UniProtKB/Swiss-Prot annotation:
InterPro entries documented for this protein: SMUG1, Uracil-DNA_glycosylase-like, Uracil-DNA_glycosylase-like_sf
Region (DNA-binding): 175-189
Pfam families in the cross-refs: UDG (PF03167)
Record's protein name: Single-strand selective monofunctional uracil DNA glycosylase
Gene: Smug1
Domain of life: Eukaryota
GO biological process: base-excision repair; DNA repair
Family, per entry: Belongs to the uracil-DNA glycosylase (UDG) superfamily. SMUG1 family.
Binding positions (substrate): M86, F100, N165, H241
Protein species of origin: Mus musculus (Mouse)
Role summary: Recognizes base lesions in the genome and initiates base excision DNA repair. Acts as a monofunctional DNA glycosylase specific for uracil (U) residues in DNA with a preference for single-stranded DNA substrates. The activity is greater toward mismatches (U/G) compared to matches (U/A). Excises uracil (U), 5-formyluracil (fU) and uracil derivatives bearing an oxidized group at C5 [5-hydroxyuracil (hoU) and 5-hydroxymethyluracil (hmU)] in ssDNA and dsDNA, but not analogous cytosine derivatives (5-hydroxycytosine and 5-formylcytosine), nor other oxidized bases.
DNA-binding listed as a keyword: yes
A Gene Ontology term for the protein's cellular component: nucleoplasm
Amino acid sequence: MAASQTFPLGPTHEPASALMEPLPCTRSLAEGFLEEELRLNAELSQLQFPEPVGVIYNPVDYAWEPHRNYVTRYCQGPKEVLFLGMNPGPFGMAQTGVPFGEVNVVRDWLGVGGPVLTPPQEHPKRPVLGLECPQSEVSGARFWGFFRTLCGQPQVFFRHCFVHNLCPLLFLAPSGRNLTPAELPAKQREQLLSICDAALCRQVQLLGVRLVVGVGRLAEQRARRALAGLTPEVQVEGLLHPSPRSAQANKGWEAAARERLQELGLLPLLTDEGSARPT
């Protein structure tokens, strides 16, 4: 049996120190959000994961610079809508530090960059190449490609919205196969997601979010569970995941996403002309 895995924050840098440059009067919203992420990192670092987990990647750690760049650039004010993914993919956020972070979109549309370090443990079949990764993440290309077409400029999307993952960790089997949180042993899965749920509550309250859109069924379910009973109430809805493993998504995810956003009344928020607010 493989030894249980923990993931250190890493001796190569100290991301917390990067937050020690406060604004003259008070910390920014982005700094507060990053501090919450570092708090979550510290809590998750105490967990151990037995088989089937072989290696754990935490891109909020080793891809700290582009991740901080993303948050600092696009989380400057309150957000009405949070699009919530589940956890990083091996060719998206695991490479770039950005949720659904397909390399070309991150570099060419979001304009996010920065050095990506080598994880403390790196699986030979899943090397971390940062923005030099030659493989495109289909989910991320679909997700951000849709909003690029709809919004035109990133500033239009991020005026009211933000994108975040519930869990910052990527789990790999000894073979290098991606393991979703749903595939973890029940006890470890619940420990992990309970901590992430609590962090989500704090993050939603910090940003002033009124609507969480879970991208995929599991993200939606966890958000409903985590945010039940919050005051003021936070609405939770779902959006089909753009995964290539989804037959429904492969039939036309962009059309399905547009229809769903229309149902939720979000399209006006995502265009230059729109000034409506979600109900």
